[in-house]
Regions:
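Bacterial N-terminal signal peptides that target proteins for export
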Residues: 1-9
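Hydrophobic helical h-region of N-terminal Sec-dependent signal peptides
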Residues: 10-15
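C-terminal motif of bacterial Sec signal peptides marking the signal peptidase cleavage site
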Residues: 18-19
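Accessory carbohydrate-recognition regions in carbohydrate-active enzymes
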Residues: 25-414, 418-464, 470-511, 524-545, ...
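ATP-dependent phospho-/nucleotidyl transfer catalytic cores
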Residues: 516
Length: 782
């Protein structure tokens, strides 16, 4: 949609059809892509977020569902700007063909940066603040357009319109040039988000085609400023619609001793060295440390030039084959339409009715963001780079995928996918299992990027995803091997030596490890491994070792058993025993043993009062804060605790409040990093009226839906039913409390569903009112 009118949807752009269901609720036959606004979350701004993490960090460019390629504008290189784009920036430095979505820790990818220019050749992008000039261009915000599978903008410095679209393995750029004798397409082959590729190669194959590669190692920064251990090579096969009659290279001689990390590659000495690089025009191929390529040509007013690119992480032959199979014979309009069709098909896994246009846009954009990762990592022929850095070929049982942001996505993203796309969950698990196998590490990584064991964040989140999948009937992988690797993971990273994990970050580590061990216990019990189940259930109780009865709360503990000093603001002091949170937020993370947690905390009434205080002190803008901090993951289960405390109306109240205040149809519409689908998946589930409270069991909490009707299309390979529907009668912004419920036409008085009831298909009807019904859903859970 046009950003200038992002809150407006043109009614005539789709057909409204109505059909009365048996429950008397109108069904809308809408087109999901009409409600996707890729600008939501597309900001890294620290100022707008009020915290170093920034906002959503999503990208607005074109991609396909779970595609390998993302063709997106980039406005900044260096720093912690993982998407390469931030809406408040006034200039664009180019259009990359790979991007990460919604993450921190410097990010990575952003490779193969293409920029159309005119006039004198510039070899550096320059700086966003204008202090150093280069080929970057200002752009007209009013012309910036983004839809599912399409992006366009006008570069005002060059008077060039740029449009992008994508197939799963390829991207396409269409440039509309002005009349100019020196028009140009130039490519920065060294560019990489959060750093640089460390070596590159380019070869001119014929009058229209180039191919090559860009090698990215930790020495060039990237993921975690190099600490994330990302080590990959991007291969490309690029074809231009105009002949390469006047082309050239530039190659900067970077001294071996120079540091090439995010800050250094945008420093004045580094940029000076690149700007002084000689132009080379007498060769067909070149390899170097910092290469660029350009092709120049005259253009007429309004002349369109296309550039198509195939991408592979395997080899140059793979990039060429991806190109030939997916995009060689297609023009821009065809690629754009096919991308839109792919998105409509995937987004139709959930159908909604009711809500405002803005709420529909938040919903379908959220669903869109959950369908970026885990992305495909195989070429069209099934080949991929494995955990041993060798070429493998998938056997047809699964699709190899990459980007597993475990600490984030086990909470909502994978439970959502277990409902609407269980094959994706199976793919992700098979990908983690094969990586552990091929690398010979035989344990699960908590944050995987392109086969890297990055060690990012904490806990053992893959154990949660595995247990949750198994308990929900997703078992299309080597179960015994998967289980053994789970046991190995717990042994390598856990609370075994002391019964807790000592400082630093002892609260977070201990509680997260305890939950993961409970997940292994669930698996062991289901597999008939009774001794293992008993042992891991006991390990799941390790959270108790971090609770200081004198203080009445979880407290950091040292290796010698002593407690860390208790400051005056112990509960709300960020990093006091906790990662990216405080003890007041992290301390609620005992999802696998809520009764035990409540007992430690002084009983149900005490806990309800404490939870109420947590929410009452939360700022209305929901930005980063010391209380209910929805901008980060540790609290994402907390609103659903009220269901288990026999006050489900508080779950209903606060989830509706969060949906309204933490999400919006605007750039700043995600209050924290989107985190590879997690923030979006939370909204989709909560706004639909259900959400897990403890992945690894099959309980799904019922809450107050934003929408009048939500239909989840199920997968017949994994589920017995075809559709599970949630209907909210008499639903509006005031009537947010559930008065009664029917499940498949029969009275239902539980505030939760079992996943089997969802998988069987059927209908949950909720009857809403403006006051809490303090009798519905009260089952003395504790």
């Amino acid at each position: 949609m046009y950003k200038a009118s992002a809150n407006i949807l043109i009614a005539c752009s789709f057909l409204w059809l109505t059909a009365c269901s048996s429950a008397g609720v109108v069904t809308e036959d809408l087109i999901p892509t009409d409600y996707v606004n890729p600008f939501i979350g597309a900001s890294t701004s620290v100022g707008a977020a009020g915290v170093y993490h920034g906002l959503g960090k999503t990208f607005p460019g074109a991609t396909t569902p779970y595609g390998m390629v993302q063709v997106s504008p980039n406005t900044i290189t260096g720093g912690d700007n993982s998407s390469g784009y931030s809406d408040e920036h006034k200039t664009i430095e180019g259009f990359a063909f790979t991007q990460m979505s919604g993450v921190g820790w410097f990010g990575d990818l952003g490779n193969f940066l293409v920029m159309p220019t005119t006039g004198e050749l510039q070899k550096i992008a320059g700086k966003e603040d204008g202090s150093i000039k280069g080929y970057r261009s200002s752009y007209d915000k009013a012309t910036e357009t983004a839809k599912a599978g399409y992006y366009s903008v006008e570069l005002t410095d060059y008077k060039i319109k740029v449009e992008s679209s994508a197939t799963p393995h390829c991207g396409i750029l269409q440039f509309t040039f002005p009349s100019n004798e020196q028009s140009r397409i130039q490519i920065d082959l060294a560019r990489r988000v959060g750093g640089t590729s460390t070596s590159q190669y380019v070869k001119v194959l014929d009058d229209y085609t180039i191919q090559g590669w860009m090698k990215c190692t930790p020495d060039g920064g990237g993921w975690g400023n190099g600490e994330g251990n990302s080590d990959y090579t991007v291969y490309y096969y690029a074809q231009f619609s105009k002949p390469l009659s006047n082309y050239g290279f530039w190659s900067a001689d970077i001294p071996d001793e120079w540091v090439r990390k995010p800050d250094e590659v945008v420093s004045i000495p580094y940029l000076t060295r690149i700007s002084q690089a000689p132009v080379i025009k007498d060769k067909k191929e070149l390899e170097g440390k910092h290469l660029g390529f350009f092709t120049e040509f005259p253009t007429k007013e309004g002349e369109q030039v296309e550039m198509k690119v195939g991408i592979s992480f395997v080899d140059m032959e793979g990039a060429a084959n991806n190109f030939k199979q997916e995009i060689a014979s297609k023009n821009f309009a065809q690629v754009k339409q096919e991308a839109s069709d792919l998105w409509n098909k995937e987004l139709s896994r959930i159908r909604i009715s009711g809500g405002t246009d803005d709420e529909k846009t938040v919903f379908y954009t959220s669903l869109y963001h959950t369908m970026i990762d885990p992305r495909i990592y195989t070429d069209v022929d099934g080949r991929y780079i494995g955990g041993d850095k060798k070429v493998h070929e998938q056997d047809g049982t699964f699709t190899k995928r990459t980007i597993f942001s475990g600490w984030d996505v086990f909470r909502s993203q994978f439970p959502l996918q277990a409902m609407i796309n269980p094959r994706l969950v199976s793919d992700a698990l098979n990908s983690l299992i094969t990586m552990a196998d091929q690398s010979r590490r035989e344990y699960y990584e908590r944050w995987e990027l392109l086969n890297s064991y990055s060690g990012c964040m904490i806990g053992n989140p893959a154990l949660s995803v595995l247990a949750d999948a198994y308990m929900k009937g997703i078992r299309t992988y080597d179960v015994e091997k998967a289980y053994q690797y789970a046991v190995n993971t717990s042994a390598k990273f856990g609370n075994d030596s002391l019964g807790y994990t000592p400082e630093p970050l002892s609260i977070s580590y201990t509680l997260e490890y305890a939950y993961a061990d409970w997940c292994v216990a669930q698996l062991a019990k289901a597999l008939g491994k009774e001794e293992d189940a008993k042992r891991f259930y006991e390990k799941g109780q390790a959270y108790r070792n971090m609770f200081d009865a004198e203080k009445g709360w979880f407290r950091p503990r040292n290796a010698d058993g002593s407690w860390k000093a208790w400051p005056e603001n112990a509960l709300t002091e960020e990093w006091y025993g906790c990662i990216e949170s405080n003890a007041y937020q992290q301390g609620w993370f005992v999802p696998h043993d809520v009764p035990g947690m409540v007992e430690l905390m002084g009983g149900k009434e005490e806990v309800i009062a404490n939870l109420t205080n947590l929410f009452d002190h939360t700022p209305s803008d929901m930005l980063w804060n010391d209380y209910y901090n929805h901008a980060n993951e540790p609290v994402h289960f907390v609103p659903f605790l009220f269901n288990q405390l026999d006050v489900p109306w508080y779950t209903q109240k606060w989830t509706r409040y969060i949906c309204k205040n933490a999400y919006a149809n605007k750039v700043e519409g995600i209050v924290g990093n989107e985190d590879v689908g997690q923030m979006s998946a939370w909204y989709i589930l909560a706004a639909s009226g259900i959400h897990p409270s403890c992945p690894g069991n099959t309980r799904m909490e019922i809450t107050s839906p934003v929408f009048d009707k939500v239909e989840f299309n199920l997968d017949s390979q994994y589920h017995q039913g075809k559709v599970f529907t949630i209907i909210a009668h008499n639903n509006n912004t005031n009537n947010l409390y559930i008065q009664k419920a029917l499940l498949n036409g029969k009275e239902y008085n539980k505030c939760y569903l079992d996943f089997a009831e969802i998988a069987a298909g059927g209908t949950l009807e909720l009857f809403m009112g403006d006051k809490p019904n303090t009798e519905w859903g009260v089952l003395s859970n504790i």
